[in-house]
Amino acid sequence: MTVQTSKNPQVDIAEDNAFFPSEYSLSQYTSPVSDLDGVDYPKPYRGKHKILVIAADERYLPTDNGKLFSTGNHPIETLLPLYHLHAAGFEFEVATISGLMTKFEYWAMPQKDEKVMPFFEQHKSLFRNPKKLADVVASLNADSEYAAIFVPGGHGALIGLPESQDVAAALQWAIKNDRFVISLCHGPAAFLALRHGDNPLNGYSICAFPDAADKQTPEIGYMPGHLTWYFGEELKKMGMNIINDDITGRVHKDRKLLTGDSPFAANALGKLAAQEMLAAYAG
């Protein structure tokens, strides 16, 4: 007999009127083991350049009916790209807007993954004790050791990052100083921080989570309501081109901007980023 899982969002008792994804949506879109593979970098980077991760520091995203979606950074979208980059020789630092700890969507953590979970445990302190982004931005110059900025996905990227002047300054520095920018799924919402000033990403093409898919997820209880705005629409208004309208695990390179469409693209994006950065810094 087939057991039917509920499509009702699950209550998050830590906050009033807040909800996790439904049992059904978790059964469809999460797994206890990731699809990590292809981690093969026989000549890793040995220098000082590293990755700056701009992580989410807020958990609750309001929806159109007043209910809160309990979110953060998606673990797969965060950890798989970093696993590849770390294996390729690039260390990383974590920063949040507030300097407070990174929020993760723990309901998507691959708890039985024998490679990803030890990697997370090894680096958990970086996420628990991040730098304050404003302090990082204040120290940026042409000689800074950051080779890339990485903005992980998860709906937590919709909270605060799109309005942050510090995010804008970090992205402007990266593009103008020929550094890589890496992101996937909802992470490119951070690019909206550039829309009210100098926008060096005007004309760039990316992969990202489609607005059309976000409009469907409440039907299966992934979110407890609809979003109040859609980041893809806003990115297009600021001159960016989203090349995908579906979710296939697609990745894309436009100059030094590397992007992926969803958690299904996390492993491929990690490979792409590691290969591109090795070619640039370890060649």
Curated annotation (Swiss-Prot):
It is found in: Cytoplasm. Belongs to the peptidase C56 family. HchA subfamily. Protein and nucleotide deglycase that catalyzes the deglycation of the Maillard adducts formed between amino groups of proteins or nucleotides and reactive carbonyl groups of glyoxals. Thus, functions as a protein deglycase that repairs methylglyoxal- and glyoxal-glycated proteins, and releases repaired proteins and lactate or glycolate, respectively. Deglycates cysteine, arginine and lysine residues in proteins, and thus reactivates these proteins by reversing glycation by glyoxals. Induction: By heat shock. Coiled coil: none annotated. It comes from Escherichia coli O157:H7. It catalyses: N(omega)-(1-hydroxy-2-oxopropyl)-L-arginyl-[protein] + H2O = lactate + L-arginyl-[protein] + H(+); N(6)-(1-hydroxy-2-oxopropyl)-L-lysyl-[protein] + H2O = lactate + L-lysyl-[protein] + H(+); S-(1-hydroxy-2-oxopropyl)-L-cysteinyl-[protein] + H2O = lactate + L-cysteinyl-[protein] + H(+); N(omega)-(1-hydroxy-2-oxoethyl)-L-arginyl-[protein] + H2O = L-arginyl-[protein] + glycolate + H(+). This is Protein/nucleic acid deglycase HchA. Zn(2+) binds at residues 86, 91, 123. It is an enzyme of class 3 (hydrolase). Its EC number is 3.1.2.-, 3.5.1.-, 3.5.1.124. GO terms for cellular component: cytoplasm. Keywords: Cytoplasm, DNA damage, DNA repair, Hydrolase, Metal-binding, Stress response, Zinc. Homodimer. The keyword Magnesium does not apply. The active site is at residue 185. GO terms for biological process: DNA repair; methylglyoxal catabolic process to D-lactate via S-lactoyl-glutathione; protein repair.
